[in-house]
Amino acid sequence: MPSPMKAGGTAIAVVALGLALAGCGSDTKSAPSSSASSSNSSKSSSAKSSSAAPSTPAQAGKNETIADYIKESGITETPVKRGEPGTPTLDLPIPAGWEDAGAKTPDYAWGAIVSTDPTMAADPPSIVALMSKLTGDVDPAKILEYAPGELKNLPGFEGGDGNTSTLGGFDAYQIGGSYVKDGAKRMIAQKTVVIPSKGDVFVLQLNADGLEDQMGPLMDATSQIDEKTTITP
């Protein structure tokens, strides 16, 4: 998620990354971050859609999130692991030049991939997938409404409001931008997908994260994921 942003600054990079995660605008129509992911998206950079126009830095902690909605609505959230019985089947492609994160996958994640480029080995770009099962009076529209809040609350976040989209035929919301971690600016894009299944609602979140000069590999990878991912509820 390198060079494109040099042509027009971070603003262009943010938009480009978001569009890549959105499938370059294809399959876009009128997702989430769970309460677990809202505390973990900025932690996933080492293992580890979009904005229409850049905005000024967001004020940390000022935007309502999916985690807030879950808590306020008395909804029960259960983290989902890959292959767990009774959960949606997610087939995420692994692009060339990337590999499964394996033991480096965060404990809270459904799965993760990282770049294998040796020039980025010190801090490789990553894409982390999280999934949660929501039980209770869940309004899918509210999940999408509050999806942008998590990224907007990251330290020094700069980006747009994001936009609606789809992934694997399911409604989603994507947002992208930059934020500051350990004094360095990083690029991040997030796609939140709502998957109704067997009377429950599952929420899938994809977090693509990397340094500013890793924009290119991230764009290529997220584009393939958007085009080739299949979801079976």
Segments predicted by a language model, with ranges:
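Signature of long, low-cysteine stretches enriched in small and polar/charged residues
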Residues: 142-193
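Soluble non-cytosolic domains of exported or imported proteins
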Residues: 89, 137-141, 212-220
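N-terminal low-complexity, Pro/Thr/Ser-rich intrinsically disordered segments
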Residues: 44-84
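N-terminal export and membrane-targeting signals
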Residues: 1-14
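Short, well-structured beta-strand
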Residues: 171-233
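Bacterial lipoprotein signal-peptidase II cleavage site
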Residues: 6-9, 20-57
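Extracytoplasmic/secreted envelope proteins and their assembly/folding machinery
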Residues: 95, 141-148, 219-226
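Secretory pathway targeting signatures of secreted, lumenal, and periplasmic proteins
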Residues: 81-137
